[in-house]
Amino acid sequence: MKILAVVLISVIVLNTANGENYYPQKYTNDYYGCQKQTDAFCDKVCKLHLADSGFCDQSWGLAKACKCVNVSYDNSFFFNALESQCPLLNKSAA
């Protein structure tokens, strides 16, 4: 039982530390579409969201959206990513 608990905690810690892949959202809570864009566009968008990289993904049928690699869930949202980059925007610091 102790081994199972240690394994579970290890998995949670590794997922939290490494981040995951998420679709970043604009300030309007819409996804960044890439129907007419390239992977380079998505890579720039994702780096603004503090991800390692990004690419154009077509997981939703005909719709294409940018997907970020190794980004935290919080930073997948536009204003959260801004607050992470600029401490002056952080409400709790005021």
From Swiss-Prot:
The UniProt entry lists the main location of this chain as: secreted
Q: Where is the signal peptide?
A: 1-19
Tell me where in or outside the cell this protein is found.
Secreted
Its GO CC terms are: extracellular region
Gene3D superfamilies, per the entry = Knottin, scorpion toxin-like
- Give tissue specificity per the record: Expressed by the venom gland.
Q: Which residues form the LCN-type CS-alpha/beta domain?
A: 20-87
**The organism sits in which domain of life?**
Eukaryota
Q: Which GO terms describe its molecular function?
A: potassium channel regulator activity; sodium channel inhibitor activity; toxin activity
Disulfide bridges in this chain: C34-C56, C42-C66, C46-C68
Q: Which SUPFAM superfamilies match?
A: Scorpion toxin-like
User: Which keywords does the record carry?
Assistant: Disulfide bond, G-protein coupled receptor impairing toxin, Ion channel impairing toxin, Neurotoxin, Potassium channel impairing toxin, Secreted, Signal, Toxin, Voltage-gated potassium channel impairing toxin, Voltage-gated sodium channel impairing toxin
Q: What does this protein do?
A: The homodimer inhibits HMG-CoA reductase (HMGCR) (32% of inhibition produced by 0.6 uM), a glycoprotein involved in the control of cholesterol biosynthesis. The inhibitory effects of bumarsin are seen at much lower concentrations (0.6 uM) than that for statins such as atorvastatin (5 mM) and simvastatin (10 uM). In addition to inhibition of HMG-CoA reductase, this protein lowers cholesterol levels by inducing steroid hormone synthesis via StAR, and by increasing reverse cholesterol transport mediated by the induction of ABCA1 and APOA1. The heterodimer non-edited LVP1 induces lipolysis in rat adipocytes. Induction of lipolysis by LVP1 appears to be mediated through the beta-2 adrenergic receptor pathway (ADRB2).
Subunit description? Homodimer; disulfide-linked or monomer (edited version) or heterodimer of an alpha chain (AC D9U299 or AC D9U2A4) and this beta chain (non-edited version).
Q: What is known of its domains?
A: Has the structural arrangement of an alpha-helix connected to antiparallel beta-sheets by disulfide bonds (CS-alpha/beta).
Provide the family line.
Belongs to the long (3 C-C) scorpion toxin superfamily.
Q: Please give the name of this protein.
A: Lipolysis-activating peptide 1-beta chain
